[in-house]
């Protein structure tokens, strides 16, 4: 599966400022060449170090991906840091030629997708400012082969660049839902298989079989801690949730009561901004 990111990249003049208003490089849609355009995740990531910021609500995530697509395919929206707040004034679907930079564009997309303006930020303080909105989970470090979902915001760990995933894995999948609980919050089948060679040998990347194993066995095996999905470790979750320990008891060293902690996070914890890694 090819993952795509959208972002405000650079002016047609090859500089951060001084370009004509609007996207001078866009020639067609979907736009993969413009000042504001899409590119593959691998070309977006390059060699830099990144954080991933994920919306708490699936609907917001899907809306963020759609918002960035609208922006990337809008020929009236170009790149120029000297007029970076133009997109805030006119919006991502503007019919008036205007400008943005990478951070102001993400701000505008968040506003379009959620109805909330998180305020001005740059790549230096994006994690803090976006996090204060209450709309997103705690930022996590990007790792190679991490499952990136449509709507995920990816920002450099230091001053640099920021964008939104326009085409990634869907958080609306029903394949990881069991008895009304979405275990996709704690289980990434590909990650689970890759981190557990015995399971990969037995099941390959079969989502149904890996979910079944997780629910029957893996969730209660300490040897699987930190090996179900990149951004959730049940041991960390339990150790930083003393209120849950009072209800469920301490997490046993063999992991045999792990299921209740996994299930709690899927049903409640992921919306409560609890620490998971």
What does each of the following model-derived ranges do?
Residues 1-113, 158-161, 169-180:
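N-terminal capping segments
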Residues 112-135, 167:
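Short, basic/aromatic beta-hairpin or loop at an interaction surface
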Residues 142-147:
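Short, surface-exposed secondary-structure edge patches
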Residues 150-152:
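Loop/turn positions that initiate beta-strands
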Residues 177-277:
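Charge-rich, low-complexity intrinsically disordered regions
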